Amino acid sequence: LPFYYYNMPSITGVNLPVDKFLVEGKKKIPNLVGTKFTHNNLMEMGVCIELEQHRFEVLHGYDEILISGLAMGAVAGVGSTYNYIPNVYQAIFDSMKMNDLETARHNQIKSIRTVEVIIKYGGGVRGGKAIMKLIGIDCGSCRLPIKPFSVDEYEKLRGDLDAIKFFEF
């Protein structure tokens, strides 16, 4: 099975040079094929993409700046908000392949607005699970210490999503 190094310093607290990890890691991990690059350091991402004549696959992990990662050469994206607005991301991928930056930016803004709402409600796990429930997929409550959503919060979340036309995406 292919192995990808999951680079997400904002959550793990581990911030190492990914390019060096890929080169040295490949010596010890034969099935290392790339990284899920969840960081906004696009300079470092570009170095990883160019390593050894594109030897490693770089998957972009920041939903709200996907077009930047694709423009740098990421081969794909992996993100939590793809679960509830997949058509937005498909439109970004398709329009980037066709060099239609206007459409890509239009859809990227939808992603950004969605992420802003999620952050307002406690971030990816808490806000994301609540959105999944609102679209009809109940993934259950978050584990402690993350507080479950109250009925009032669900109503406010729905209102904020309505304000950005989320249910029309």
What are these regions (language model features)?
Residues 67-169:
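Structured C-terminal cap/extension of enzyme domains
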Residues 8, 63, 82:
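Short, ordered loop/turn segments at secondary-structure junctions
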Residues 6, 56-59, 92-93, 109:
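Broad hydrophobic/π-residue packing in well-ordered secondary structure
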Residues 1-57:
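Glycine/proline-rich, positively charged
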Residues 36-37, 61, 80-81:
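Small/polar loops that bind or transfer phosphate-bearing groups
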Residues 33-35, 52-55, 60, 68, ...:
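Short linear motifs at secondary-structure transitions and domain/linker junctions
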Residues 42-45, 56-77:
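Anionic-ligand binding region
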